[in-house]
């Protein structure tokens, strides 16, 4: 275990001094963004998978001062992992959980760490994993506050989904595409939003064993930039969810080719194959029936973000004034390269091309449509 570079700090302080690692985090309170940032010390999070997303997410939460992190992985650090963030070459051969805990505890000794070096998909390990969700909180015997899924296969995602459904625990799923140019995060609240099995991926719907698709010498692409962006999206959503500020995204994607961030809300499937999901759906319907004034989580968060924007405009000790919101910016800067809807099926819109001779030219700009192009072609000689 690495020796910490400083003594533990019992209580977060907003005092602006060089030796205070929390002063810039606590400034969020002064800016009117977060009302209770110090509450992060009372929260616990499970991270399953310490790959390109999970390891970076663990570091971010550690630097943010989370109360407790429970780390799950059964893999070892390899030189092939060095194209990503976090792990170092000298840690090669160590279990990812051990290497991660060594690094993270040296970054912030205030955080409690618990590491488990096993595969959660086996029967015995699954029961232990579920037990840590239920009783592995900051105070032993209490549940953790959130589970983050940062795994790269369907089997592990299904195990996390099953454990959280059985316990009624919310979790966030994340992933990056095999070509490394897109990714997503998804908040899964049992009964309120789609669980992982509500809309199964094609590989499962087709009845294919994903293990048969792995070929020797062939691997998925990996970019540290995409991994870092998705990890940032995941932790940002985690902070908003746990500290109750801003708008918590239900489903947020990222397309690196267009720098496009689509959003959507995934409703639960009433014909989901998971019986626990159906039970939670029925409970949530009953809850809404008995509480007609209750809105879905998206509406609640929309109200929160509007209130926070108004508050942060003027109410801070530095007198900083907000002159433009992201909504204003989007309205004033139309980008026709981006689709007008929030479809996650969109990947790349190929620009129209026209073959011309040396004397002929056709001007094509971002606002050109098919009719304009046809008129220009007809006028050519």
UniProtKB/Swiss-Prot annotation:
One MF term in the entry's GO annotations = metal ion binding
> Which domain of life, per UniProt?
Eukaryota
Q: Which of this chain's residues are annotated to bind ATP?
A: 52, 73, 96, 119, 153
Family matches, as InterPro entries:
ThiF/MoeB/HesA, ThiF_NAD_FAD-bd, Ubiquitin-activating_enz
Recorded GO CC terms: cytoplasm; cytosol
GO BP terms, alphabetized: protein ufmylation
What Pfam families would the database entry show? ThiF (PF00899)
Q: Which UniProt keywords apply?
A: ATP-binding, Metal-binding, Nucleotide-binding, Ubl conjugation pathway, Zinc
Active site annotation, chain numbering: 219 (glycyl thioester intermediate)
Positions bound to Zn(2+): 195, 198, 272, 277
Metal-binding keyword on record: yes
Q: Which SUPFAM superfamilies match?
A: Activating enzymes of the ubiquitin-like proteins (SSF69572)
Question: What does the sequence similarity comment in the record state about its family?
Answer: Belongs to the ubiquitin-activating E1 family. UBA5 subfamily.
What is the recorded function of this protein according to its Swiss-Prot or TrEMBL entry? Answer: E1-like enzyme which activates ufm1.
Official protein name in the record: Ubiquitin-like modifier-activating enzyme 5
């Amino acid at each position: 275990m690495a020796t910490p570079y400083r003594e533990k700090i019992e209580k977060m302080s907003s005092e602006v001094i060089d030796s205070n690692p929390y002063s810039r985090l606590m400034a969020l309170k002064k800016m009117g963004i977060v009302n209770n940032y110090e509450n992060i010390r009372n929260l616990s999070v499970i991270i399953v998978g310490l790959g390109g997303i999970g390891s970076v997410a663990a570091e971010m939460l550690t630097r943010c001062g989370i109360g407790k992190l429970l780390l799950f992985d059964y893999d070892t650090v390899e030189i092939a992992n060095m194209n990503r963030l976090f792990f170092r070459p000298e840690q090669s051969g160590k279990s990812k959980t051990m290497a991660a805990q060594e690094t993270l505890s040296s970054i912030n000794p205030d955080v409690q760490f618990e590491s488990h070096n096993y595969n959660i998909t086996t029967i015995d390990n699954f029961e232990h994993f579920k037990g840590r969700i239920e009783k592995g909180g900051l105070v032993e015997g209490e549940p953790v506050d959130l589970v983050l899924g940062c795994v790269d296969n369907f089997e592990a995602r299904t195990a996390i989904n099953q454990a959280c459904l059985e316990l009624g625990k919310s979790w966030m799923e994340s992933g990056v595409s095999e070509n490394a140019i897109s990714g997503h995060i998804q908040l899964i609240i049992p009964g309120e939003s789609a669980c992982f099995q509500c809309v199964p991926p094609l590989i499962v719907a087709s009845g294919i064993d994903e293990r048969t698709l792995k070929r020797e010498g062939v691997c998925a692409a990996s970019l540290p930039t995409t991994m870092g962006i998705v990890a940032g999206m995941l932790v940002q959503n985690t902070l908003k969810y746990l500290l109750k500020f801003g708008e918590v995204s239900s489903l947020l994607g990222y397309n690196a080719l267009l720098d496009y961030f689509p959003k959507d809300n995934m409703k639960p499937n009433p014909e989901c194959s998971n019986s626990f999901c159906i039970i939670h759906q029925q409970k949530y319907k009953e809850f809404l029936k008995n509480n007609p004034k209750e809105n879905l989580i998206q509406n609640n968060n929309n109200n929160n973000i509007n209130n926070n924007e108004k508050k942060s405009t003027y109410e801070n000790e530095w007198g900083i004034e907000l002159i433009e919101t992201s909504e204003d910016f989007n309205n004033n800067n139309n980008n026709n390269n981006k689709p007008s809807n929030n479809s996650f099926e969109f990947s790349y819109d190929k620009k129209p091309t026209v073959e011309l001779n040396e004397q002929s030219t056709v001007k094509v700009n971002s606002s050109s449509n098919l009719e304009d192009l046809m008129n220009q072609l007809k006028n050519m000689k």
